[in-house]
């Protein structure tokens, strides 16, 4: 959502890449009695998604077998889920996660909120096209069929991917938007949700950051405080996620990661999704933000919250240890 200038992932193209050697190494690691999980995880995580796709193609050519199917049959549990996620083409991953969230058992609103609030307009357009091509279904129609109320309306607005890409900020419009948001919430009885939906789904990132500052000046409240007092349910959660992503995409996703591991139990699906989807974009930056916000490293929290090959794979995906 926010500008990703200076963003850095933890996974890059491997130098001296040899897809034939990698395919043979993976086949050997899964052939016969036992599976060499350590070799598999180290090889796949040290290759970019594009390189993994080439390995899968070469694997099928050499052995007449599907690499993902072999991983599924040889691995198990959360470790399998993570490694299989790494094999999904990057452009397809978000579309698959949304499809599962909408069409699985019950609607996984947190997944829909996380993806739709944090992706750029260009990424959302790509997700829509991929979703249509892969599932022969319209993302907007599926969302409308599975959600309701203002939550549905804001999602539909975000799916249009019409956020202003222009970096220039019009100070007069900033003032107008801040006042419109104030008049739609804190300054009236009830809440004019349409104003929040319209402004938060169409204005540019730099513009909205200025709007949030001006809103604080006018109202004496942070916009997040007003959203919490004026709205509720999934609509509130989505509004907050959009605002947080606009302020700092890395800050928002660091919070998502922290919440996936804090307290009893771990939301492994969220942990996997964020690490996999951001590993080649800005996971290094998310790691830095995580430490700054929570006083502990992402590595340390993963170390204490997970175990076995699954933990080893997650830690490797996070990049070098920064404790």
UniProtKB/Swiss-Prot annotation:
Protein name per UniProt: Annexin A5
Gene3D superfamilies the UniProt entry points to: Annexin
GO MF: calcium ion binding; calcium-dependent phospholipid binding; phosphatidylserine binding
Segments forming a coiled coil: none
Naturally occurring in which organism (per UniProt): Cynops pyrrhogaster (Japanese fire-bellied newt)
Comment block on domains: A pair of annexin repeats may form one binding site for calcium and phospholipid.
InterPro entries: Annexin (IPR001464), Annexin_repeat (IPR018502), Annexin_repeat_CS (IPR018252), Annexin_sf (IPR037104), ANX5 (IPR002392)
Mapped Annexin repeat ranges: 17-88, 89-160, 172-244, 248-319
Family assignment from sequence similarity: Belongs to the annexin family.
């Amino acid at each position: 959502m926010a500008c990703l200038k200076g963003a850095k992932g933890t996974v890059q193209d491997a130098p001296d890449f040899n897809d034939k050697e990698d395919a043979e190494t993976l086949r050997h690691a899964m052939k016969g009695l036992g599976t060499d999980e350590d070799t598999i995880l180290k090889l796949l995580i040290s290759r970019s998604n594009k390189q993994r796709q080439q390995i899968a193609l070469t694997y099928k050519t050499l052995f007449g077998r599907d690499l993902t199917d072999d991983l599924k049959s040889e691995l198990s549990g959360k470790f399998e889920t993570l490694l299989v996620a790494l094999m999904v083409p990057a452009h397809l991953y978000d579309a698959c996660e949304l499809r599962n969230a909408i069409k699985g058992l019950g609607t996984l609103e947190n997944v829909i909120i996380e993806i739709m609030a944090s992706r750029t307009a260009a990424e959302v357009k790509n997700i829509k096209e991929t979703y249509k091509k892969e599932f022969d279904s319209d993302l907007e129609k599926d969302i409308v069929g599975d959600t309701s109320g203002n939550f549905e309306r804001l999602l539909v607005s975000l799916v249009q991917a019409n956020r202003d890409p222009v970096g220039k900020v019009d100070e007069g419009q900033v003032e107008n938007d801040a006042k419109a948001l104030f008049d739609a919430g804190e300054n009236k009885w009830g809440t004019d949700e349409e104003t929040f939906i319209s402004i938060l789904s169409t204005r540019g990132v730099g513009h909205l950051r200025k709007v949030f500052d001006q809103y604080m000046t006018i109202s004496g409240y942070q916009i997040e405080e007003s959203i919490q007092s004026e709205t509720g349910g999934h609509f509130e959660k989505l509004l907050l996620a959009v605002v947080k992503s606009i302020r700092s995409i890395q800050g928002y996703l660091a919070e998502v990661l922290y919440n996936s591991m804090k307290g009893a139990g771990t939301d492994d699906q969220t942990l996997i999704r964020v690490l996999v989807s951001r590993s080649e974009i800005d996971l290094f930056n998310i790691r830095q933000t995580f430490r700054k916000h929570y006083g502990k490293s992402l590595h340390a929290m993963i170390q204490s919250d997970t175990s076995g090959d699954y933990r080893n794979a997650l830690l490797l995906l996070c990049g070098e240890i920064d404790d």
